[in-house]
Amino acid sequence: MQETEMKKSEQRLTREVYEDGRPSLFYVLRIRKGEHFSRDRVCYSLLAFVLEGEVEMSTGIYVKEIACEGQMFVVHKGDNGYTKGLKDAVILLCSFDSSMALCNGLSLGNATEDYKEPTPEERQSQGLPRLEIKSMLMTELKLIQHEVESNLLGYRFMEFKRYIIVYMLRTLYNKEELFYMFRCVRSDDFDFRDKVLHFYTCDINAQELCAKMEMSSATFNRRFKRAFGMPCGEWLNSKRQVQVLMDLKTTDLSVKEIAGKYNLTPNYLTDFCKRFLGDVPVNLR
Protein backbone atom coordinates (compact mmCIF):
# COMPACT_ATOMS: atom_id res chain seq x y z
CA MET A 1 0.00 0.00 0.00
CA GLN A 2 2.79 2.40 0.93
CA GLU A 3 4.69 1.73 -2.31
CA THR A 4 1.54 2.46 -4.34
CA GLU A 5 0.94 5.70 -2.47
CA MET A 6 4.54 6.77 -2.93
CA LYS A 7 4.40 6.13 -6.67
CA LYS A 8 1.21 8.16 -7.00
CA SER A 9 2.84 11.01 -5.12
CA GLU A 10 5.93 10.86 -7.32
CA GLN A 11 3.77 11.10 -10.43
CA ARG A 12 2.27 14.35 -9.21
CA LEU A 13 5.64 16.03 -8.62
CA THR A 14 6.51 18.20 -11.60
CA ARG A 15 10.00 17.76 -13.02
CA GLU A 16 12.89 18.74 -10.77
CA VAL A 17 15.65 18.78 -13.40
CA TYR A 18 15.78 20.07 -16.99
CA GLU A 19 17.09 17.90 -19.80
CA ASP A 20 20.40 19.81 -19.73
CA GLY A 21 20.85 18.90 -16.06
CA ARG A 22 20.03 22.27 -14.53
CA PRO A 23 17.68 22.11 -11.53
CA SER A 24 14.16 23.39 -11.94
CA LEU A 25 13.72 26.52 -9.83
CA PHE A 26 10.02 25.79 -9.22
CA TYR A 27 8.12 22.55 -8.95
CA VAL A 28 4.73 21.50 -7.63
CA LEU A 29 3.96 18.67 -5.22
CA ARG A 30 0.39 17.38 -5.02
CA ILE A 31 -0.19 15.01 -2.14
CA ARG A 32 -3.48 13.38 -1.12
CA LYS A 33 -4.82 12.87 2.38
CA GLY A 34 -3.03 9.92 3.99
CA GLU A 35 -0.32 9.84 1.32
CA HIS A 36 3.40 9.97 2.13
CA PHE A 37 6.24 11.68 0.26
CA SER A 38 9.90 11.62 1.30
CA ARG A 39 13.41 12.67 0.31
CA ASP A 40 16.51 11.16 1.94
CA ARG A 41 18.55 14.25 1.14
CA VAL A 42 17.40 17.56 -0.30
CA CYS A 43 19.85 18.76 -2.96
CA TYR A 44 18.91 22.46 -2.79
CA SER A 45 17.48 24.72 -0.12
CA LEU A 46 13.77 25.15 -0.76
CA LEU A 47 11.07 27.68 -0.03
CA ALA A 48 7.87 25.68 0.46
CA PHE A 49 4.51 27.41 -0.05
CA VAL A 50 1.39 25.49 1.02
CA LEU A 51 -1.18 26.68 -1.52
CA GLU A 52 -3.93 24.23 -0.55
CA GLY A 53 -4.63 21.68 2.18
CA GLU A 54 -2.64 20.64 5.22
CA VAL A 55 0.46 18.46 5.71
CA GLU A 56 2.55 16.99 8.50
CA MET A 57 6.24 17.77 7.97
CA SER A 58 9.39 16.26 9.43
CA THR A 59 12.64 17.83 8.24
CA GLY A 60 16.01 18.66 9.74
CA ILE A 61 15.58 18.86 13.51
CA TYR A 62 11.81 19.25 13.38
CA VAL A 63 9.45 16.28 13.76
CA LYS A 64 5.71 16.11 12.98
CA GLU A 65 5.19 19.83 12.36
CA ILE A 66 1.84 20.88 10.87
CA ALA A 67 1.84 23.25 7.89
CA CYS A 68 -1.52 24.57 6.68
CA GLU A 69 -2.85 26.31 3.59
CA GLY A 70 -1.48 29.83 3.41
CA GLN A 71 1.80 29.11 5.22
CA MET A 72 5.40 29.03 3.98
CA PHE A 73 8.57 27.53 5.45
CA VAL A 74 12.14 26.59 4.51
CA VAL A 75 13.65 23.13 3.89
CA HIS A 76 17.43 23.26 4.11
CA LYS A 77 19.95 21.83 1.66
CA GLY A 78 21.27 18.47 2.85
CA ASP A 79 18.35 17.78 5.16
CA ASN A 80 15.92 14.94 4.69
CA GLY A 81 12.21 15.52 4.39
CA TYR A 82 9.07 13.54 5.14
CA THR A 83 5.59 14.80 4.28
CA LYS A 84 2.21 13.25 5.07
CA GLY A 85 -1.02 14.67 3.69
CA LEU A 86 -3.51 15.49 6.45
CA LYS A 87 -5.77 16.94 3.76
CA ASP A 88 -5.38 16.95 -0.03
CA ALA A 89 -2.56 19.46 -0.49
CA VAL A 90 -0.70 21.45 -3.13
CA ILE A 91 2.80 22.72 -2.30
CA LEU A 92 4.85 25.00 -4.56
CA LEU A 93 8.60 24.55 -4.04
CA CYS A 94 11.19 27.18 -5.01
CA SER A 95 14.91 26.36 -4.86
CA PHE A 96 17.44 28.99 -3.80
CA ASP A 97 21.01 29.43 -2.56
CA SER A 98 22.88 31.53 -0.02
CA SER A 99 23.47 34.43 -2.41
CA MET A 100 19.77 35.33 -2.57
CA ALA A 101 19.52 38.76 -0.92
CA LEU A 102 16.23 39.37 0.86
CA CYS A 103 16.61 42.93 1.99
CA ASN A 104 19.23 45.63 2.32
CA GLY A 105 21.85 44.51 4.81
CA LEU A 106 20.34 41.06 5.26
CA SER A 107 21.29 38.23 2.94
CA LEU A 108 21.19 34.48 3.40
CA GLY A 109 24.94 34.17 3.35
CA ASN A 110 25.84 36.83 5.90
CA ALA A 111 24.87 36.98 9.54
CA THR A 112 24.05 40.33 11.09
CA GLU A 113 24.54 41.54 14.62
CA ASP A 114 21.08 43.13 14.63
CA TYR A 115 19.32 39.87 15.50
CA LYS A 116 20.00 37.32 18.19
CA GLU A 117 20.33 33.68 17.19
CA PRO A 118 17.88 31.44 19.11
CA THR A 119 19.24 28.88 21.56
CA PRO A 120 18.80 25.14 20.83
CA GLU A 121 16.03 25.06 23.42
CA GLU A 122 14.26 27.99 21.73
CA ARG A 123 14.56 26.30 18.32
CA GLN A 124 12.91 23.14 19.62
CA SER A 125 10.17 24.90 21.58
CA GLN A 126 9.30 27.36 18.80
CA GLY A 127 9.10 24.62 16.18
CA LEU A 128 9.58 24.88 12.41
CA PRO A 129 9.79 28.59 11.47
CA ARG A 130 6.91 29.52 9.16
CA LEU A 131 5.17 32.67 7.99
CA GLU A 132 1.69 33.39 6.68
CA ILE A 133 1.51 33.94 2.91
CA LYS A 134 0.06 37.38 2.26
CA SER A 135 -2.72 37.71 -0.31
CA MET A 136 -0.68 39.53 -2.96
CA LEU A 137 2.06 36.90 -2.75
CA MET A 138 -0.49 34.06 -2.86
CA THR A 139 -1.91 35.44 -6.12
CA GLU A 140 1.53 35.33 -7.74
CA LEU A 141 2.30 31.86 -6.35
CA LYS A 142 -0.89 30.36 -7.75
CA LEU A 143 -0.09 31.87 -11.14
CA ILE A 144 3.37 30.26 -11.01
CA GLN A 145 1.78 26.94 -10.01
CA HIS A 146 -0.45 27.04 -13.09
CA GLU A 147 2.49 28.00 -15.33
CA VAL A 148 4.70 25.20 -13.96
CA GLU A 149 2.01 22.53 -14.32
CA SER A 150 1.29 23.76 -17.84
CA ASN A 151 5.02 23.53 -18.75
CA LEU A 152 5.09 27.20 -19.70
CA LEU A 153 8.19 28.20 -17.76
CA GLY A 154 11.65 27.94 -19.33
CA TYR A 155 14.71 28.30 -17.13
CA ARG A 156 15.22 32.03 -17.74
CA PHE A 157 11.54 32.74 -17.16
CA MET A 158 11.76 30.78 -13.90
CA GLU A 159 14.71 32.93 -12.82
CA PHE A 160 12.60 36.01 -13.48
CA LYS A 161 9.69 34.55 -11.50
CA ARG A 162 11.98 33.74 -8.60
CA TYR A 163 13.23 37.32 -8.65
CA ILE A 164 9.62 38.48 -8.36
CA ILE A 165 9.09 36.22 -5.35
CA VAL A 166 12.25 37.55 -3.68
CA TYR A 167 11.19 41.13 -4.38
CA MET A 168 7.75 40.48 -2.89
CA LEU A 169 9.29 38.92 0.22
CA ARG A 170 11.49 41.98 0.65
CA THR A 171 8.51 44.29 0.16
CA LEU A 172 5.77 42.51 2.12
CA TYR A 173 7.75 41.25 5.13
CA ASN A 174 10.06 43.05 7.54
CA LYS A 175 13.60 42.04 8.48
CA GLU A 176 12.54 40.40 11.73
CA GLU A 177 10.05 38.15 9.93
CA LEU A 178 12.56 37.15 7.25
CA PHE A 179 15.25 36.49 9.82
CA TYR A 180 12.82 34.30 11.75
CA MET A 181 12.07 32.07 8.76
CA PHE A 182 15.55 32.01 7.21
CA ARG A 183 17.54 31.99 10.46
CA CYS A 184 19.04 28.52 9.94
CA VAL A 185 19.97 29.27 6.33
CA ARG A 186 21.63 32.53 7.27
CA SER A 187 24.68 30.78 8.66
CA ASP A 188 27.89 32.74 8.17
CA ASP A 189 29.76 29.46 7.73
CA PHE A 190 28.27 27.87 4.61
CA ASP A 191 31.43 26.02 3.60
CA PHE A 192 31.61 24.34 7.00
CA ARG A 193 27.91 23.50 6.92
CA ASP A 194 28.10 21.99 3.44
CA LYS A 195 31.14 19.92 4.42
CA VAL A 196 29.29 18.55 7.47
CA LEU A 197 26.32 17.59 5.31
CA HIS A 198 28.69 15.94 2.82
CA PHE A 199 30.19 13.68 5.50
CA TYR A 200 26.96 13.07 7.39
CA THR A 201 25.52 9.54 7.35
CA CYS A 202 22.64 8.13 9.35
CA ASP A 203 24.91 6.03 11.59
CA ILE A 204 27.67 8.55 12.27
CA ASN A 205 28.35 9.96 15.74
CA ALA A 206 29.79 13.33 16.78
CA GLN A 207 33.31 11.99 17.35
CA GLU A 208 33.43 10.32 13.91
CA LEU A 209 32.09 13.44 12.22
CA CYS A 210 34.71 15.57 13.96
CA ALA A 211 37.46 13.21 12.74
CA LYS A 212 36.22 13.43 9.13
CA MET A 213 36.28 17.23 9.36
CA GLU A 214 39.97 17.02 10.45
CA MET A 215 39.54 19.54 13.27
CA SER A 216 40.25 19.61 16.97
CA SER A 217 37.22 18.88 19.14
CA ALA A 218 37.14 22.45 20.47
CA THR A 219 37.24 24.03 17.00
CA PHE A 220 34.70 21.59 15.58
CA ASN A 221 32.26 22.08 18.45
CA ARG A 222 32.54 25.88 18.29
CA ARG A 223 32.06 26.07 14.54
CA PHE A 224 29.30 23.47 14.54
CA LYS A 225 27.23 25.36 17.09
CA ARG A 226 27.77 28.60 15.17
CA ALA A 227 26.72 27.04 11.85
CA PHE A 228 23.82 24.87 13.05
CA GLY A 229 22.69 26.68 16.19
CA MET A 230 23.09 23.71 18.53
CA PRO A 231 25.66 21.12 19.68
CA CYS A 232 26.49 18.32 17.25
CA GLY A 233 25.02 15.59 19.46
CA GLU A 234 21.63 17.32 19.66
CA TRP A 235 21.60 17.91 15.91
CA LEU A 236 22.44 14.27 15.14
CA ASN A 237 19.73 13.07 17.52
CA SER A 238 17.12 15.33 15.90
CA LYS A 239 18.14 14.17 12.43
CA ARG A 240 17.83 10.56 13.54
CA GLN A 241 14.29 11.16 14.78
CA VAL A 242 13.23 12.33 11.32
CA GLN A 243 15.03 9.52 9.51
CA VAL A 244 13.66 6.77 11.75
CA LEU A 245 10.16 8.16 11.28
CA MET A 246 10.68 8.18 7.50
CA ASP A 247 11.89 4.57 7.55
CA LEU A 248 8.89 3.46 9.59
CA LYS A 249 6.38 5.34 7.45
CA THR A 250 7.73 4.91 3.94
CA THR A 251 9.60 1.58 3.83
CA ASP A 252 8.90 -2.08 4.50
CA LEU A 253 12.10 -2.53 6.53
CA SER A 254 11.65 -4.56 9.70
CA VAL A 255 12.38 -3.00 13.09
CA LYS A 256 15.54 -5.12 13.25
CA GLU A 257 16.67 -3.86 9.82
CA ILE A 258 16.00 -0.23 10.76
CA ALA A 259 17.92 -0.66 14.01
CA GLY A 260 20.85 -2.15 12.09
CA LYS A 261 20.86 0.81 9.71
CA TYR A 262 21.65 3.11 12.64
CA ASN A 263 23.95 0.66 14.48
CA LEU A 264 21.34 0.22 17.23
CA THR A 265 19.78 -2.81 18.86
CA PRO A 266 16.02 -3.36 18.31
CA ASN A 267 15.41 -2.74 22.02
CA TYR A 268 17.31 0.54 21.92
CA LEU A 269 15.37 1.61 18.81
CA THR A 270 12.09 0.85 20.58
CA ASP A 271 13.15 2.95 23.57
CA PHE A 272 14.31 5.72 21.21
CA CYS A 273 10.93 5.80 19.44
CA LYS A 274 8.99 5.83 22.71
CA ARG A 275 11.11 8.66 24.10
CA PHE A 276 11.39 10.93 21.07
CA LEU A 277 8.53 9.94 18.73
CA GLY A 278 5.91 9.16 21.33
CA ASP A 279 5.19 5.48 20.62
CA VAL A 280 6.70 2.09 19.83
CA PRO A 281 7.77 1.42 16.21
CA VAL A 282 4.86 -0.87 15.32
CA ASN A 283 2.34 1.84 16.26
CA LEU A 284 4.20 4.53 14.33
CA ARG A 285 3.93 2.65 11.02
Please give the residue ranges for each predicted region.
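N-terminal positioning helix adjacent to the helix-turn-helix/winged-helix DNA-binding module
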Residues: 136, 161, 184-192, 228, ...
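Glycine-centered loop/turn positions within well-structured domains
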Residues: 55, 81, 230, 242, ...
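Basic/polar phosphate-binding segments, predominantly the helix-turn-helix DNA-binding elements
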Residues: 207-239, 251, 257-284
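Basic, amphipathic alpha-helical hairpins
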Residues: 142-157, 168-178, 191-205, 224, ...
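Recognition helices and adjacent regulatory flanks at domain boundaries
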Residues: 166-186, 193-198, 208-211, 219, ...
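N-terminal regulatory/effector-sensing and dimerization cores
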Residues: 18-121, 154-155
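A short, N-terminal "cap"/entry segment at the start of jelly-roll beta-barrel domains
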Residues: 1-20, 150
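Amphipathic alpha-helical segments enriched in hydrophobic/aromatic residues interleaved with Lys/Arg
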Residues: 109-168, 194
